[in-house]
């Protein structure tokens, strides 16, 4: 399969710059992958497509305010530091990306402050890639105080394609209501559509709500740089699947109930046949890393349905959706979505493939 097959024209005005007023009021396109039938409803109506003991798998990662704007200590030059992951909480050491990279070298000190007078100084201690650096924050106070100040200084890492300033609303809306375990720098966007009320309605209907953790990284928005998809290697992400969750999902499979992956981060994680899932489609508890990359054609052995968004051309998420629903069908329904003016991107509308 070639990357260029996933190119299509997306009118700029269909990229949602802001979320819908209410989480569960977005539009929902329902796609029956066996027949190709398409229905158009509101997201909160998704409950009508599931029955008692059908099982949802959510990603409970929490997005950190990863984008810091500061200055070089001596020159005052503006810099941006993007937090990727914490390496050593005791030493306050992080793996980061910096911009402008050519002007930020080992030994440089960076200064960050905000309108609330939160301040912190950091020192570059190593290089990792052309833009990658290892940074140590120079803070001697309690760890919780450090994290509070750091996150107060940071902005939510909304994707660059939104091409707008971060707002206070993003702090809440670029986060699922069930976010629990911090570590992501990309929101599990399919989950953004779930409200507290909708989650409660699913529980009352008898659906099983299960949670895994996938700390989604910048690789989700990194451009695929090869035409031959077999040559592409995705970035690794840290995942956690506990025993309780694995047991519930395996029971659903054994009882032939629907298993719905909420988002592509969940979908690819539970298809990791090296670490997570057996050849029969049963999950093992696992804590570690995965770099599973999925594109058509692919035989899924765990999920029976998928909730996802409308993704941008040539994106890794689009490849996964096309693998799940079938390439021809998904590219056709994307044409229908554009004609019907569905909203694309992380704050856009949703799709259910069943």
Swiss-Prot record:
Function text: Transfers and isomerizes the ribose moiety from AdoMet to the 7-aminomethyl group of 7-deazaguanine (preQ1-tRNA) to give epoxyqueuosine (oQ-tRNA).
Top-rank taxon: Bacteria
Subunit (UniProt): Monomer.
Keywords, comma-separated and alphabetical: Cytoplasm, Queuosine biosynthesis, S-adenosyl-L-methionine, Transferase
Name of this protein: S-adenosylmethionine:tRNA ribosyltransferase-isomerase
UniProt family annotation: Belongs to the QueA family.
Entry EC number(s): 2.4.99.17
Record keyword Cytoplasm present: yes
EC main group: transferase
Any single GO CC term annotated in Swiss-Prot or TrEMBL for this entry: cytoplasm
Known catalytic reactions: 7-aminomethyl-7-carbaguanosine(34) in tRNA + S-adenosyl-L-methionine = epoxyqueuosine(34) in tRNA + adenine + L-methionine + 2 H(+)
Name of the encoding gene: queA
Molecular function per GO: S-adenosylmethionine:tRNA ribosyltransferase-isomerase activity
Species name: Azobacteroides pseudotrichonymphae genomovar. CFP2
Pathway where this protein functions: tRNA modification; tRNA-queuosine biosynthesis
Record-linked HAMAP family: QueA
NCBIfam families in the record: PRK00147.1, queA
The keyword Cytoplasm is annotated on this UniProt entry: yes
GO BP of this protein: queuosine biosynthetic process; tRNA wobble guanine modification
SUPFAM superfamilies reported in the protein's UniProt record: QueA-like
InterPro entries on file: QueA (IPR003699), QueA_dom1 (IPR042118), QueA_dom2 (IPR042119), QueA_sf (IPR036100)
Localization in the cell: Cytoplasm
Pfam families the UniProt entry points to: Queuosine_synth (PF02547)
